């Protein structure tokens, strides 16, 4: 069944809504669940069904192939400089040494290992670049297969503008 195939992070989000320490108001609040689309291509066959289920009571932030794409968007002119010229490589996201292509590209651009360097949090100061740059790629999570996709900056912008549903 679909419920058996639900990724653990959606189940976790649903469980957290019931956590009395959080005081989640189902009428007013939405849980934001952020994940990489590439996990579906490997592990979950029913991507569209999972997205539909997840969107039912949550806001889904999806990056394809991986979260490092969102991080890369925090740099001025990231689309023209880094994403557009490497689009095929980003989507295939093959290993470069011991890292996937997008992580390696991000590390080259930023000088930061996103998994280990705490200074990664400083990128929040550049989120306005991410909002502008993300508009240049696909933001439709329903059409992300085979496309460089991210909608995380859009969610942040919607929250800023009180448009998040």
Would you name each region that the model predicts?
Residues 2-6:
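Short, small-residue-biased leader/transition segments that mark boundaries at the very start
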Residues 11-19:
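Glycine-rich, highly charged phosphate/nucleotide-binding loops
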Residues 18-32, 37-165:
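C-terminal accessory helical subdomains adjacent to catalytic cores in phosphodiester-
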């Amino acid at each position: 069944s679909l419920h058996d195939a639900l990724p653990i992070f959606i189940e976790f989000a649903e469980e957290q809504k019931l956590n009395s320490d959080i005081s989640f108001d189902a009428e007013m609040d939405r849980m934001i669940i952020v994940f990489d689309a590439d996990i579906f291509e490997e592990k979950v066959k029913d991507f569209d069904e999972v997205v539909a289920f997840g969107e039912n009571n949550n806001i889904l932030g999806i990056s394809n192939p991986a979260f490092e794409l969102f991080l890369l968007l925090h740099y001025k002119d990231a689309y023209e400089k880094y994403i557009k010229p490497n689009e095929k490589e980003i989507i295939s996201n093959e290993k470069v040494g011991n890292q996937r292509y997008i992580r390696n590209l991000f590390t080259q651009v930023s000088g930061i290992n996103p998994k280990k360097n705490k200074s990664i949090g400083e990128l929040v100061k550049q989120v306005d670049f991410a909002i502008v740059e993300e508009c240049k790629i696909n933001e439709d999570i329903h059409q992300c297969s085979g496309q460089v996709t991210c909608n995380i900056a859009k969610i942040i912008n919607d929250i800023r503008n009180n448009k998040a549903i």
